[in-house]
Curated annotation (Swiss-Prot):
Residues 547-929 are annotated as: Carbamoyl phosphate synthetic domain. Residues 402-546 are annotated as: Oligomerization domain. ATP 2 binds at R707, R746, L748, E752, G777, V778, H779, S780, Q820, E832. This is Carbamoyl phosphate synthase large chain. It comes from Staphylococcus aureus (strain bovine RF122 / ET3-1).
Length: 1057
């Protein structure tokens, strides 16, 4: 069937900011889809609120709108652009929910916009739990015993019939938001009321728990002619009960018999045919390990996290083909881009094993609730490819960057066996490593199986890994055993530990005896057809399939899994760097291990190596490819941390030299440079022990800010006010980075300013200066950034420009540099310098039209900025005002305090742009999920030091008609100024504030941190309650002030004459 000619313009809705449950996989899917539609000749209009993505680059669509993903804003774009059609299935749950709202409000009908791809009725049938269950009953496909509830009372009625445990699944949410497993009445009450709150339809499915069944997924495609294929089937190692995004996944499935595989395949195809899916779809099934009984769990009628994984696992570009199916093309007329000869109707076959392991944020949130269930907690994931299951698992483990490189914990031998078993009996993010530890201690596989329900097949594989460890110990230095361990994915580091050698000695031993990996191609067809994809993985076999060309090569290190502090912004820079390398005539090679991102799409680079980002794995590739050099400044801290290790092997680091990278991080050298170029910084010292830190603080004066050197995202950074807090910190944090000392700095409260610049060794260009709304002390990734600065004087701007140029030249930067300044006591001070690409590069690149990562890469290759047409200094300002607002995923993480501070907590960001600061802020806040209302009720409870400042704020909110609730201390302060406030009780008292929040009486909460155990606990409870009830909670008065400005701009003030 030819494609549709009756439509010309297509609107694509993106997925918005990165949150837990909806990460970079939609940047990848959306980018592929937009390019595919343009390739077919359609005019593409994209709306997405996330500036950090490749998808929102001007080249990807004909028109790009970076606007909040709300009904009203998208409706305006539809009225303005008059698209013929809307494609909703590539923007995750956000895109789907938006399409449903636009349909129900009549906007699509009024503007004659058709929906492409899967029909709305089918989407609703898959997403609405009641309609889905009805269809399954009609098809005779078993679903777990379940009931749909709209109230907590109904949930208790169902519990009386079936008993515990129960699984709660809210409708129309993603990442299992609001859901969970209930074992008793208290949990049932809490989880169901939460779930009803988060479900746009106020509807939850309660089902009898089938925890312990195998969880199997099929990624399927179907077109309008009813051609349907399975692209990939996957098996979760964790049984049903853990969200698939938090499960360790293997592809293809390993423990299904052919009968089981075909049975579940037939069911998956039968269901998507009945639903009338057109495009990609993910089917999740539960299989009883002891019989042929199965249940269907759910169907995602859209491109999902699993489809990104399936695309990278097979090389089959699901999103690209789904977009083409949506405009009428069919599978039997589209070529598979990997082979270029077979059609898209051929089901991929794999001659390798894929392992995916989720990346959790608990290294950032040590107090977070680690137990895993049906609500997702991982921020990202890694994938690894091997010839055996053991090899792919161990490669995935060392890709995670937890400081773990094997099946065990660094301090594993220090735990006693009872504690280890206790940890295994609970499902959490470290269970896999504790299983390895238990097997080492001789625990039987039967006992582990009874505690975890993990299939014996996988437990035997774990046992095999431990057996090889013992063999290495018994045959130290034996080459046969070394080779054997390499076949099963062991790292040099692990072998060195067992051989009683250093990692370097094992590496040399391998080199001398020619024990090196070869690289195999990912070709979708197990080498049945000729294939030309430049997509490789390493394994220890004989035949190398990676053909080395004569062209000069540059190797770019990617940034690994998405985590807090290192998000999709670094992938954005990586992709742009690769494009610049290709334009300059070099061969561009990427090494990365994140299946969700654009950089690991095989069509981006000349060669993609899907490998762990470790010294050993990267050196193996360098030894084969012999590149001109390696680029580390676009891959975040992951890549920067490898620079030293690679340089020791004689590898050339391109761009800013290693010596200068270290100068920016080394305290004493950096201070010497600042003195030389005459740039001030807050007074500070370094400490290697608690005693030294206390002496430093006494000299500098409290408050001080303390942090380990060489970290990203403000990990383990804190502001402390006295000796006791400092001692506490030093005993906890010196762990954070033992080889590197702790920095103790005077904490200056003032305006924080962020600057990104590019330097070629001679000229420094500054695309933009950004001012933070929150005072210094809130991590830059969690602050609202404003461009251009709104409150700085000409003198301050000139000083910032001058200092930036001095710093870039003083550090001999070649490429990008990011600098944070504070303006305090009438002076500009430098807070920190990062000699690499930063979180704000995509944001500034979009605003100014200066392709920063590409210019930096060209400078690294040796081109001059003046030859590219740029003059030194700050570049001309773009028109309008732009804000970057952070987005948090606190509703997915229990027990995490949401107070903003020097440690980063946000998972993503949105951009707001308009003609005034207030309008841009309105969009930024709306896009980040803060509903800005022109009237309502605000609850204020602030620390003593903030009481004076909060008076002015209360006055302004009162004048625009906001009602004020306050705790007694704050209310008394307001009464002094005749500001009416209703007093609410402290926690546990009469008319207590938590009840008021839970009852929906409050629209905004302003709560600032008070030190001291009891009040800290209260404050923590207040903040968690607001998050769990979906109410904006502002922990910085600067953010509250900005919000008040927006409210004032939307309304009229009422003052008596």
């Amino acid at each position: 069937m030819p494609k549709r000619n009756d439509i010309k313009t297509i609107l694509v809705i993106g997925s918005g900011p990165i949150i837990i449950g909806q990460a970079a996989e939609f940047d990848y899917a959306g980018t592929q889809a937009c390019l595919a539609l343009k390739e077919e000749g359609y005019r593409v209009i994209l709306v997405n609120s996330n500036p950090a993505t490749i998808m929102t680059d001007k080249e990807i669509a004909d028109k790009v709108y970076i606007e909040p993903l709300t009904h009203d804003f998208i409706a305006r774009i539809i009225r303005k652009e008059q698209p013929d059609a809307l494609l909703p299935t590539l923007g995750g749950q956000t895109g789907l929910n938006m399409a449903i709202q636009l349909h129900e409000s009549g906007v699509l009908q009024d503007n004659n916009v058709q929906l492409l791809g899967t029909e709305l009725t089918s989407i609703q049938q898959a997403e609405d739990r009641e309609m889905f269950r009805t269809l399954m009953n009609y098809l005779n496909v078993p679903v777990p015993e379940s009931d749909i509830v709209n109230t907590v009372e109904q949930a208790f009625k169902f519990k009386e019939q079936v008993g515990y445990p129960l699984i709660v699944r809210p409708a129309f949410t993603m990442g299992g938001t609001g859901g969970g497993i209930c074992h008793n009445d208290e949990e049932l009450h809490e989880i169901v009321s939460n779930g009803l709150h988060y479900s746009p339809a106020t509807q939850c499915l309660l089902e009898k728990s089938i925890a312990g069944f195998k969880e199997i997924e099929y990624e399927v495609m179907r077109d309008k002619n009813d051609n349907a294929i399975v692209v990939c089937n996957m098996e979760n190692i964790d049984p049903v009960g853990i969200h698939t995004g938090d499960s360790i996944v293997v592809a293809p499935s390993q423990t299904l018999s052919d009968v089981e595989y075909q049975m579940l395949r037939d069911v998956s195809l039968k269901v998507i045919r009945a639903l009338g899916i057109e495009g990609g779809c993910n089917v999740q099934l539960a299989l009883d390990p002891h019989s042929f009984d199965y249940y269907i769990i759910e169907v995602n009628p859209r491109v999902s996290r699993s489809s990104a994984l399936a695309s990278k696992a097979t090389g089959y570009p699901i999103a690209k083909l789904a977009a083409k199916i949506a405009v009428g093309l069919t599978l039997d007329e589209m070529l598979n881009p990997i082979t270029g000869t077979s059609y898209a109707t051929f089901e991929p076959t794999l001659d390798y094993v894929i392992s995916k392991i989720p990346r959790f944020p608990f290294d950032k949130f040590e107090k977070g609730e680690r137990e895993l269930g049906t609500q997702m907690k991982a921020t990202g994931e890694v994938m690894a490819i091997g010839r055996t299951y053991e090899e792919s698992l161990l490669k995935a483990i060392r890709s995670l960057e937890y400081g773990v490189h094997h099946l065990g914990l660094p301090n594993g031998e220090s735990f006693d066996l009872d504690y280890i078993k206790e940890r295994i009996s609970h499902q959490d993010d470290e269970r896999l490593f504790f299983i390895g530890e238990a097997i080492r201690r001789g625990t039987t596989l039967e006992e582990i199986h009874n505690m975890t329900q993990i299939d014996y097949f996988f437990l035997h594989k774990f046992q095999n890994i431990i057996d090889i460890e013992h063999q290495l110990k018994e045959h130290q230095g034996d080459l046969e055993y070394l080779k054997y361990a390499k076949d099963y994915g062991f790292s040099d580091k692990t072998i060195a530990h067992r051989f009683n050698m250093t990692e370097e000695e094992v590496y040399q031993l391998r080199m001398e005896n020619d024990i090196k990996p070869v690289y195999k191609m990912v070709d979708t067809c197990a080498a049945e057809f000729e294939s030309s994809t430049p997509y490789y993985y390493g394994t220890y076999e004989t035949e190398n399939e990676s053909i080395i060309t004569d062209k000069e090569k540059i190797l770019v290190l990617g940034s690994g899994p998405i985590r807090i502090g290192q998000g999709v912004e670094f992938d954005y820079a990586t992709v742009h760097a690769v494009w610049a390398i290709q334009k300059a005539g070099y061969e561009a090679i990427i090494v990365n291990n994140n299946p969700e991102t654009v950089s690991t799409d095989f069509s981006i680079s000349d060669k993609l190596y899907f490998e762990p980002l470790t010294e050993e794995d990267v050196m193996n590739i360098i030894n084969l490819e012999k590149p001109k050099g390696v680029v580390v400044q676009f891959g975040g801290q992951t890549a920067i941390n490898l620079a030293d290790k690679l340089a020791k092997h004689g590898v050339k680091i391109l761009g800013t030299s290693l010596e200068n990278l270290n100068r920016a991080e080394d305290r004493k050298e950096f201070e010497a440079l600042l003195r030389k170029i005459n740039v001030p910084q807050p007074q500070g010292k370094t400490a290697t022990s608690p005693e030294e830190a206390l002496a430093n603080a006494a000299e500098i004066g409290y408050p001080v800010v303390v942090r380990p050197s060489y970290v990203l995202g403000g990990r383990a950074m804190e502001i402390v006010d006295n000796d006791k807090e400092l001692e506490n910190y030093m005993t906890q944090a010196v762990k954070a980075s033992p080889e590197h000392p702790v920095l103790v700095d005077r904490y200056l409260t003032g305006k924080e300013i962020e600057v990104d610049a590019i330097c070629d060794g001679e000229t420094v260009i500054i695309p933009g200066i950004m001012e933070h709304i929150e005072r210094a002390g809130v991590h830059s990734g969690d602050s609202i950034a404003v461009y251009p600065p709104q409150t700085l004087t000409e003198d301050e701007l000139t000083t910032l420009e001058d200092y930036t140029i001095k710093l870039a030249k003083g550090l001999n930067i070649i490429g990008l540099i990011n600098i944070q300044f504070v303006i305090a006591h009438d002076g500009v001070y430098v807070l920190e310098v990062n000699p690499r690409s930063s979180r704000t590069v995509p944001f500034l690149s979009k605003i100014t039209d200066i392709p920063m990562a590409q210019l930096a890469m060209r400078a690294i290759i040796g081109e001059k900025l003046t030859d590219m047409g740029y003059q030194e200094g700050v570049q001309p300002y773009a028109e309008g005002v732009f804000v970057k607002a952070p987005v948090f995923s606190f509703n997915k993480l229990k027990n995490v305090d949401i107070t903003l501070g020097p440690e980063m907590k946000s998972t993503g960001e949105v951009m707001g742009k308009d003609t005034t600061l207030e309008k841009a802020l309105f969009k930024g806040l709306t896009g980040s999920g803060v509903e800005v209302k022109d009237h309502g009720t605000v609850l204020m409870t602030v620390s003593d030091k903030d009481k004076e400042e909060v008076v002015k704020l209360a006055q302004r909110l009162n004048e625009v008609g906001y009602k004020i609730l306050a705790t007694s201390g704050t209310a008394n302060k307001l009464a002094e100024y005749d500001i009416p406030a209703e007093v609410v009780g402290k926690i546990g008292g009469e008319n207590d504030l938590l009840t008021r929040i839970q009852n929906g009486d409050v629209q905004i909460v302003i709560n600032t941190m008070t030190k001291g155990k009891e009040v800290e606990r209260d404050g923590f409870q207040i903040r968690r309650t607001t998050v769990e009830n979906g109410i904006p909670c502002l922990t910085s008065l600067d953010t509250a002030n900005a919000l008040t400005n927006v409210i004032e701009s939307m309304t009229f003030t009422m003052r008596q004459m």
